[in-house]
């Protein structure tokens, strides 16, 4: 779309193509000129401001990229991705590799300060995916959290095989494996803080001299297997400061934050054993069997200090609960209450764990205390067998008081992270916060083991559990994330071997079936709750690819059917190089909130 102008409008009014007498042109113009008030009225219904509210923008808010960037940068291969959420920066990246088959790709990310009346000003350049040897061009996606503007996260997907000869010689991953590269980078601040000024004085003339809060980089890499996990940034980044990573074998919730020594406002983001306060007792009366499970947990940063009386839940909490409840109620009604058995959370959990009833008080360590037992100082509840929690503090220094790196190499569960500052200096991990001085970066990881969860759900909650033999493959899709309650609702598609139902006579050999398990995972306690278990559907003549394709389509349909539009400010900003891989280019870089375009 080109910017509109008066001459365009005049010439367009005088031409009436599209049919005899220009009738087709008039009808098209009528469709294009729908009144703005009507479009705004649709906002009330849909909850979102359509990006096509205005089909064209006036020239005064449209600038050409060639006019604001020196040609040298364009010839250097800069790929411009888009605006940051704040509208202050435009982001671009470059990739470079040698001419021979043994060269690997090097990626750099750039922040440009944008002013509609002047040229772009380069304010930061960083190298992505710290020293990884990447032998094929990557699909890149740069994302920003809904409200956390302090950092961005960059995903690199290796979806195409490298050179065939190189594959054979280097014994690289085959078609059943894909590499995922991730870098989390601090965003340049609008102004220098006191710590940044101290760093500049210590290293005069070095533009990369920044404090840790405004100058850290965190990198990791992992490999996924078929069926390759879906990329869902709208859900994976829905909770600020947290990213959910599907590694094919586990779901890893990672939280990254920067603090200063002695900071009293430090708050653990994951696995803090807090739950939502008990709801006020409901009046006596029969409860409807249609009532779906309610997810009662509340994230610590959103939980105020409750008074002694019964608290009134915030509108956001009530809306989140109502939304989740409506999903399960309608899903059960749509299925006629037969294909999936909806189970409420207050039930004995796997591995001896117990889900807290909404009316039970919370004991030490996040453990539920029955009403008839007096409160007492008990030991914290043991960590469930299906989760693993780690927290490391990364600091700059000479290494005094830090653990040897070999200590962390044996950890096969947590993702390995490399943390550096902008000057390329590695930060060293520590387990104890007490010995930290100055600024430090905290990385929390809470890992949910998929296979453990699958076995526990089948053993405790599946009505067909006695028929089950083994499962051969599974696929995980996130259906919803509630940042208010810290609940993650996931769907586990499962291919398994099971004996036929006893009603089928003469069938003594196991068959291949497909089913789905829905569980809700609490990021505060680490405990999962079985939401529903699907019936067994026999796989007859279908390939695994067609099974997973149908399964993912059903997940998309479910998500879209119950989608609640986010407010205009609470969305995950996403910029990709997808157009480049399709062999085309974006037409404009649009800042939809401030109605500004950069025409490419």
UniProtKB/Swiss-Prot annotation:
Ranges where the record places region Disordered: 1-30, 277-316, 333-383
Domain of life (superkingdom): Eukaryota
Keyword Repeat carried by entry: no
Residues given in the record as Zn(2+) binding sites: 193, 196, 211, 214
Low complexity bias (residue ranges): 296-306
CDD domains tied to this protein: DCAF15-CTD, DCAF15-NTD
Keywords: Immunity, Metal-binding, Phosphoprotein, Ubl conjugation pathway, Zinc
Compositional bias annotation for Pro residues: 277-295
Gene Ontology biological process terms in this record: immune system process; protein polyubiquitination; protein ubiquitination; regulation of natural killer cell activation
One of the record's GO cellular component terms: Cul4-RING E3 ubiquitin ligase complex
Molecular functions (GO terms): metal ion binding
A Pfam family it matches: DCAF15_WD40
Compositional bias annotation for Basic and acidic residues: 333-343
Compositional bias segments (type: Gly residues): 13-27
Keyword hit for Oxidoreductase: no
PTM-bearing positions, type Phosphoserine: 50, 314
Pathway: Protein modification; protein ubiquitination
Oligomeric and partner information: Component of the DCX(DCAF15) complex, also named CLR4(DCAF15) complex, composed of DCAF15, DDB1, cullin-4 (CUL4A or CUL4B), DDA1 and RBX1.
Task performed by this protein: Substrate-recognition component of the DCX(DCAF15) complex, a cullin-4-RING E3 ubiquitin-protein ligase complex that mediates ubiquitination and degradation of target proteins. The DCX(DCAF15) complex acts as a regulator of the natural killer (NK) cells effector functions, possibly by mediating ubiquitination and degradation of cohesin subunits SMC1A and SMC3. May play a role in the activation of antigen-presenting cells (APC) and their interaction with NK cells.
Name of protein: DDB1- and CUL4-associated factor 15
Organism expressing this protein natively: Bos taurus
Gene coding for it: DCAF15
């Amino acid at each position: 779309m080109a910017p509109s102008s008066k001459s365009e409008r005049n010439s367009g009014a005088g031409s009436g193509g599209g049919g005899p007498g220009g009738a087709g042109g008039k009808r098209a113009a009528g469709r294009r000129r729908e009144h703005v008030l009507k479009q705004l009225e649709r906002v009330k219904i849909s909850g979102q401001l359509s990006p096509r509210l205005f089909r064209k923008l006036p020239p005064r808010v449209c600038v050409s990229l060639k006019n604001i960037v020196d040609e040298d940068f364009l010839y250097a291969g800069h790929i411009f991705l888009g605006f940051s959420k704040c509208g202050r920066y435009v982001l671009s990246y470059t990739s470079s590799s040698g001419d021979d088959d043994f060269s690997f790709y090097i990626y750099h990310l750039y922040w440009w300060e944008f002013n509609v009346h002047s040229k772009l000003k380069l304010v930061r350049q960083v190298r992505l995916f710290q020293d990884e040897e990447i032998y094929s061009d990557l699909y890149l996606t740069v994302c920003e959290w809904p409200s956390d503007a302090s950092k961005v996260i960059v995903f690199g997907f290796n979806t195409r095989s490298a050179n065939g000869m190189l594959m054979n010689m280097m014994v690289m991953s085959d078609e059943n494996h894909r590499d995922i590269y991730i870098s989390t980078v601090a965003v340049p601040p609008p102004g220098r803080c006191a710590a940044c000024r101290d760093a500049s004085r210590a290293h005069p003339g070095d533009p990369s001299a920044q404090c840790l809060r405004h100058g850290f980089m965190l990198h990791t890499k992992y490999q996924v297997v078929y069926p390759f996990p879906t990329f869902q940034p709208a859900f994976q980044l829905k909770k600020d400061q947290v990213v959910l990573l599907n590694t094919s074998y586990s779901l890893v919730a990672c939280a990254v934050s920067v603090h200063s020594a002695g900071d009293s406002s430090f708050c653990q983001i994951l696995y803090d054993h807090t739950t939502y306060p008990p709801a006020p007792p409901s009046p006596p009366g029969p409860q409807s069997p249609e009532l779906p499970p309610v997810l009662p947990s509340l994230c610590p940063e959103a939980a105020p200090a409750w008074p002694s009386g019964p608290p009134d839940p915030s509108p956001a909490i009530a809306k989140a609960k109502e939304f989740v409840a409506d999903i399960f109620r309608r899903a059960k009604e749509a299925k006629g209450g037969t294909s999936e058995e909806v189970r409420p959370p207050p039930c004995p959990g796997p591995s001896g764990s117990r889900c807290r009833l909404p009316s039970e008080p919370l004991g030490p360590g996040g453990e539920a205390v029955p009403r008839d037992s007096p409160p007492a100082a008990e030991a914290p509840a043991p960590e469930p067998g299906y989760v693993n929690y780690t927290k490391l503090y990364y600091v700059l220094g000479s290494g005094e008081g830090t653990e040897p790196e070999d200590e962390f190499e044996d950890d096969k569960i947590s993702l390995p992270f490399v943390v550096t500052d902008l000057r390329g200096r590695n930060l060293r991990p520590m387990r104890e916060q007490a010995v930290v001085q100055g600024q430090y970066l905290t990385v929390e990881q809470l890992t949910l083991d998929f296979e453990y969860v699958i076995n526990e759900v089948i053993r405790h909650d599946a009505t067909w559990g006695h028929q089950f033999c083994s499962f051969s493959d599974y696929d995980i899709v996130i259906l919803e994330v509630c940042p208010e309650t810290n609940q993650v609702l996931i769907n586990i598609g499962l291919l398994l071997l099971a004996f036929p139902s006893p009603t089928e006579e003469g069938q003594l050999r196991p068959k291949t079936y497909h089913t789905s398990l829905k569980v809700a995972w609490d990021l505060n306690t680490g405990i999962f709750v079985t939401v529903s278990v699907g019936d067994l559907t026999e796989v007859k003549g279908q390939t695994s690819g067609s099974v997973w394709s149908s399964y993912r389509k059903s997940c998309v349909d479910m998500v879209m059917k119950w989608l609640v539009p986010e407010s205009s400010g609470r969305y995950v900003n996403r910029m990709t190089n997808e157009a480049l891989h399709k062999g085309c280019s974006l037409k404009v870089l649009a800042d939809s909130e401030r109605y500004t375009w950069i025409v490419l």
